[in-house]
Swiss-Prot record:
It comes from Saccharomyces cerevisiae (strain Lalvin EC1118 / Prise de mousse) (Baker's yeast). Keywords: Mitochondrion, Transit peptide. Residues 1-32 form a transit peptide. This is Altered inheritance of mitochondria protein 23, mitochondrial. It is found in: Mitochondrion. GO terms for cellular component: mitochondrion. Belongs to the AIM23 family. Its main location: mitochondrion.
Length: 356
């Protein structure tokens, strides 16, 4: 039997332990602690989500949506301001030309700009009373081949709401008004682009408007005001060679915003007679008309009268010794005809003189 000294055995064990002196095993490796690294990252992500949730709650989010990121939370879309003004209103017209439909749609669009609900006031053709309505119902059944729409007045309710007074007019009147609207719109666009000069615009208005003056006169005007203020205004214009058109109507109508449109149909023969006024009112209007004739008799030719004293009237005045302008077509034709006859007569006389 081999005998080994005890000292040698102890020295060998000490040498073995010295070679592993830097290894310290504090925990045995097993299946339970195999995912310890994964748990560390999982806890860190959980903590990050908790902090994010607290931040979401501090910003006033709902508690049930606090666990979701902001980009996944569905929020209702906010309605933009003035969305009703930008909403396209569509009314289907079954009659009329394309131009007539465009004119009607232009009026409808203007109505909704002034009142987003489409509320209007209309004149009842049977009772002749102003009654409330809505353009969606009022437009039904309108035959655009015969008639059209026109805004004759606008009533201001408050700072935001207005109620237009809508009237049914002849198709030609509606188309004429729409053409004027497009012309003004195009002129404005050209001026903004710099294509049309302001001086040119002023020149055109000078030719068309400056020579023709409009004066409003109420049937209820006092006699002193008519003989002094109005008489001075009318006579001054006639002396300068301006043509003057006088508009006579009731005080409430003559002071409306679109008072001129009430006189558009007086240039043609009216169907039917307006209701008869009380004798005192009729005599008052007759006195106003007679006073106007006396005022202008010295400075103007015989006035052209349109309308009826029971309703409204137009008095067209041309100053004396002034040739009619182009818009007086009949008078211009007569003048040219007379000039041609005079020239022809002179030629005949010259021919006779040469033959002799």
């Amino acid at each position: 039997m081999l005998k080994v000294p005890l000292s040698d055995v102890l020295s060998q064990k000490m040498l073995f332990l010295k070679s592993f002196r830097y290894f310290h095993c504090t925990k045995y490796f097993s299946r339970d602690n195999a995912s310890s690294t994964t748990d560390i990252f999982r806890n860190a992500m959980k903590r990050k989500r908790e902090l994010a949730n607290l931040k979401e709650q501090s910003h006033g989010n709902v508690a049930r949506n606090a666990a979701f990121p902001k980009e996944y939370i569905k929020r209702p879309k906010q309605v933009p301001r003035n969305a009703t003004n930008r909403k396209k209103i569509l009314i289907t017209w079954s009659t009329g030309t394309d131009r007539a439909k465009e004119a009607a749609n232009s009026v409808v669009s203007e109505i909704f700009k002034k009142n987003h609900k489409g509320n209007i006031k209309v004149v009842d053709p049977t009772t002749h009373r102003i009654e409330p309505s809505n353009i969606r119902y009022f437009a039904k059944g309108i035959d655009l081949d015969k008639v059209g729409l026109s805004i004759v007045n606008v009533e201001q309710i408050d700072n935001e709401n207005q109620i237009p007074l809508v009237k049914i007019v002849e198709s030609r009147v509606a188309l004429k008004k729409y053409s004027d609207f497009l012309a003004k719109k195009k002129e404005k666009e050209l001026m903004e682009l710099g294509v049309l000069n302001k001086s040119y615009k002023n020149l055109v208005t000078d030719k068309k408007e400056d020579n023709l003056k409009h004066i409003k006169i109420s049937w209820q005007i006092e006699s002193d005001d008519l003989k002094r203020q109005k008489a001075h205004e009318i006579v001054s214009l006639l002396k300068k060679g301006n043509k003057v058109t006088l508009y006579l109507d009731d005080k409430n109508n003559i002071n409306s915003n679109n008072w001129l449109e009430n006189f558009e149909e007086l240039d043609r023969s009216q169907k039917g007679e307006p209701p008869r006024l009380p004798e005192s009112v009729f005599q008052k209007r007759a006195a106003v008309l007679e006073t106007l004739k006396e005022i202008v008799s010295e400075y103007a030719n015989d006035p052209v009268l349109l309308g009826n004293m029971n309703s409204k009237m137009i008095m067209k005045l041309i100053p004396k010794d002034v040739k009619p302008q182009n818009n007086d077509k009949r008078a211009l034709k007569e003048l040219r005809k007379k000039e041609r006859q005079e020239k022809l007569q002179k030629r005949i006389q010259r021919k006779k003189m040469n033959e002799m």
